[in-house]
Amino acid sequence: ACRSGNGLVLANAAPIMHSVFELLTGPKEDIKGVRCCVFVTDSSGVLLTKLDSQPFPIRPGMVFDERLIGTNSVHSCMENRYISTVYGFEHYFEEFSGYVASAAPIITEDGVVHGAFGVLLHCGDYDLSIKAMSDVASKAVSSLVNSSVHRSHREFLLDHIDDAII
């Protein structure tokens, strides 16, 4: 039910999620081999989808609301409209105490927050490149969502202009 209204975010986030996941877990020698979870939420902080290399304590449908699970990067990034990183000891929710999460908002140029793009890792696997990667990925998804919104507006206008001219 939560996923139905988020097709635009899911469709545009999927290729970016796969790229980030492959970069972190794939067979080459860069930052590879990291145990991670790459995820996307909707504008209410509901986890829509994830890619993980092993079981992590999040699942689709989970709500990243501070009132429910305490301090978390998803809620913080959407509230502050800026990337947020929360380290293990900063999590109120005990299941997250061994993890670090970086999340950044998916925002279109009209100022609408559509969700968040994040990476969750074990604390020992974290370095600052993960924060940068989350931020760049959210901006890429934001750009794709923005293009899709403009495309649908343009198609709507063209459909109605044709009707008006005829």
Predicted regions and their residues:
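Extracellular/periplasmic ligand-binding regions of membrane signal-transduction receptors
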Residues: 1-16, 135-142
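Short, flexible loop segments at the rims of nucleotide/cofactor-binding pockets, characterized by
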Residues: 16, 62-64, 142-146
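Sensory modules in modular signal-transduction proteins
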Residues: 17-41, 146-166
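Amphipathic coiled-coil signal-relay and dimerization helices
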Residues: 46-52, 57
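Residue-level detector of alpha-helix boundaries and kinks
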Residues: 9-12, 29-30, 62
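Generic macromolecular interface patches on structured domains
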Residues: 55, 87, 143-147
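Sensory/regulatory domains in signal-transduction proteins
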Residues: 43, 58-140
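Bateman (tandem CBS) regulatory domains
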Residues: 5-8, 58-59, 161
